[in-house]
A protein has these predicted regions:
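Peripheral, non-catalytic segments that deliver or gate enzyme domains
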Residues: 1-251
């Protein structure tokens, strides 16, 4: 994880020495290479998640056939188990990102047979709130801007995004006007947020990278992923729907 309060600081996971406690979290200075202990690991944990302030609040591991995951309240916290599930079971969960409040986090979990987006609280993780589900398609993953979850993506006949943030939705609409007929993806932005690195693609257009001025809406192409691949060499994408052998409709 990058750290908002330190441009040279990152959090990294290391296994074994010098902690000898499985995976643990360390703070590293990328300019000097110096590391120091941040959050000590414990048995069976394989992955930690830190919020934008660098506080490790979630951990996930393995215990036999189950995947327990737990949460804490900050440095020196006592960890407690939040849930235990089978990796491919209907109750499996996938961490997406932290919410606006320190104790909130987004996760993907089943709803009516489809993967959906939920908002949970570390204080009451067993009663999450459903934020978005689609009757036909699984939610595929988060849309992250500046390490914030601003929406979730899903794939129908075309890529789609359900935004949770009005400012992000307005910015996405501006980018779509900038690259009409293409699907824009925000890759990165300048520190002041005015210059945007955007990846635009379509079924008959290989990815193109543009530098977009947010204030003026002007853009210029800076790179093409496949410059020798023309649109006349690509086919238009069409949705296909058919019934499976058991009668279920496959979108």
């Amino acid at each position: 994880s990058m750290l908002d309060d330190d441009p040279n600081g990152v959090l990294v996971q290391l296994c074994g020495e010098p902690t000898d406690a499985g995976w643990s979290v360390f703070r590293m200075d990328v300019a000097t290479g110096h590391i120091r202990a941040h959050t000590r690991g414990f048995s069976s944990v394989g992955r930690f998640h830190a919020d934008p302030d660098g506080v490790v609040r979630l951990a996930k591991g393995a215990s036999g056939k189950n995947l327990p995951w737990g949460g804490g309240e900050g440095g020196g916290q006592r960890w407690r188990e939040l849930a235990r599930y089978q990796p491919l079971g209907a109750d499996a969960v996938e961490f997406v990102g932290f919410g606006a409040k320190p104790a909130e986090f987004y996760m993907l979990r089943d709803h009516a047979g489809r993967k959906a987006l939920w908002l949970a609280d570390l204080g009451n993780p067993r009663n999450p709130r459903l934020l978005f589900s689609h009757p036909e398609f699984d939610v595929e993953g988060p849309v992250l801007w500046n390490d914030r979850v601003v929406g979730v993506a899903y794939q129908g006949d075309r890529p789609e995004i359900r935004f949770l943030d009005e400012d992000a939705q307005a910015l996405f609409a501006m980018l779509k006007r900038t690259v009409p007929g293409s699907f824009p993806e925000l890759v990165d932005r300048s520190a002041d947020g005015n210059r945007l690195l955007v990846r635009a693609s379509a079924d008959r257009q290989p990815p193109v990278y543009l530098l977009v001025d947010r204030d003026t809406g002007r853009s210029r192409v800076i790179a093409r992923a496949y410059p020798d691949l023309g649109s006349d060499m690509l086919s238009a994408m069409n949705g296909i729907h058919f019934p499976a052998r058991d009668g279920a409709r496959v979108p």
